[in-house]
UniProtKB/Swiss-Prot annotation:
SUPFAM superfamilies: Nucleotide-diphospho-sugar transferases. Pfam families: Glyco_transf_8. InterPro entries: Glyco_trans_8, Glycosyltrans_8_dom-fam, Nucleotide-diphossugar_trans. GO terms for molecular function: polygalacturonate 4-alpha-galacturonosyltransferase activity. It comes from Arabidopsis thaliana (Mouse-ear cress). Keywords: Cell wall biogenesis/degradation, Glycoprotein, Glycosyltransferase, Golgi apparatus, Membrane, Signal-anchor, Transferase, Transmembrane, Transmembrane helix. This is Probable galacturonosyltransferase-like 9. It is a single-pass type II membrane protein. The lineage of its organism: Eukaryota, Viridiplantae, Streptophyta, Embryophyta, Tracheophyta. Disulfide bonds: none annotated.
């Protein structure tokens, strides 16, 4: 029997849980931020908007502190830290800021997390401007900004079903072994359209067994054939690359990566090889995902689905509202066309977009419509109905 609950009691309780659970987490102390906003306008007049300074999340006594005081330098090479890699650009900046905020808020030891932020060389906002904005929003954050040279990959990119998937920065994950400091042996890669509502250390502690290079939630019930064109499957040789494997779909927006094995196996080159084949013969339509499936599918460390409740941005064409997968949630992912900050500002949010909103540090210039509230639908089951996320 499936119980149905009023939205006001069920989802409000869930939202309150997401907002306040860090206050009761082991080892975390929260110091309120100043109610001031930081903003940046780049030289060409592109306005990045204003962001409110985040509360300061500090380690509690239970944590093994990685620095004795705020002035101490925290090295990007420190293997005792949790290392998270994300991209940083003007278009998705608001999502990246919210993602970082959510991880700090829910981390058991927030000062033990180091963020490796990758910015495009020719973004409307320079890497320096983006770095300054991150520092102003999170004054005590452990992070480093790396510059991604877009000409590294731009000639390998083929057209996709959605223009956003053609952004060169979307391919930065292919080059993490080259971009990040050589001393970084392991990293969690996360897309910018996520929020984490659990302790990121739990994901970090994932073991990559055997010879596996990456770990990610797998979805073996998905129709794997649709990620490649009929030209791929009709080719006499190409489907044979899956021979001896049981390939399953996985989403590359959440991955635990062993960069030592990645570099040793030259996996960047393996991904580039498939991109070169794609330029000669169209074998897929979905941007940076299919090369990862071709190289890794069937040899991925399976991580609990709770760590990538993906597809919340809807499909790649309409961006329609989606429901949650069944089961517990540690990470919500707005993969697909629709992004929560865009839909909220346009006053047409999907129900789950309101779970992203508490982590948004953007200084809002658009007043939320009163009829677009957290209680815009009738039952919790509307959030958890079965639906296709692939």
């Amino acid at each position: 029997m499936r119980l149905r609950f009023p939205m006001k009691s069920a989802v409000l309780a869930f939202a309150i849980f997401l907002v306040f659970i860090p206050l009761f987490s082991v080892g975390i102390r929260m110091i309120p931020g100043r109610l001031t906003a930081v903003s940046a306008t780049v030289g060409n007049g592109f306005d990045l908007g204003s962001f409110v300074e985040a509360p300061e999340y500090r380690n509690g006594k239970e944590c093994v502190s990685q620095s004795l005081n705020r002035e101490n330098f925290v090295s990007s090479c420190d293997a005792s830290l949790v290392h998270v890699a994300m991209t940083l650009d003007s278009e998705y900046l608001r999502g990246s800021i919210a993602a970082v905020h959510s991880m700090l808020r829910h981390a058991s030891c927030p000062e033990n997390v180091f963020f490796h932020l990758i910015a495009a060389e020719f973004d409307p906002a320079s890497p320096r401007v983006l770095s300054q904005l991150v520092r102003s929003t999170f004054p005590s954050l452990n992070f480093k900004v790396y510059i991604f040279r877009e000409d590294t990959v731009i000639n390998l990119i083929s057209s996709s079903i959605r223009q956003a998937l053609e952004n060169p920065l979307n391919y930065a994950r292919n080059y993490l072994g080259d971009i990040l400091d050589p001393c970084v042996d392991r990293v969690i890669y996360l897309d910018s359209d996520i929020i984490v509502v659990d302790d990121i250390t739990k994901l970090w502690n994932t073991s990559l067994t055997g010879s596996r290079i990456i770990g990610a939630p797998e979805y073996c019930h998905a129709n794997f054939t649709k990620y490649f064109t009929s030209g791929f499957w009709s080719d006499p040789a190409l489907p044979g690359f899956f021979s001896g494997r049981k390939p399953c779909y996985f989403n590359t927006g959440v991955m635990v990566m062993d960069l030592v094995r990645w570099r040793e196996g030259n996996y960047r080159e393996k991904l580039e090889t498939w991109m070169q084949i794609q330029k000669k013969k169209r074998i897929y339509d979905l941007g940076s995902l299919p090369p990862f499936l071709l190289v890794f599918a069937g040899n991925v460390e399976a991580i609990d689905h709770r760590w990538n409740q993906h597809g919340l941005g809807g499909d790649n064409v309409r961006g329609s509202c989606r429901s949650l997968h069944k089961g517990p949630v540690s990470l919500l992912h707005w993969s697909g066309k629709g992004k929560p900050w865009v839909r909220l500002d346009e006053k047409r949010p999907c129900p789950l977009d309101h779970l992203w909103e508490p982590y948004d540090l953007y200084e809002h210039k658009i007043e939320r419509a009163k009829d677009q509230s957290l209680f815009g639908f009738s039952s919790l089951s509307e959030l958890t109905e079965d639906s296709s996320f692939f």
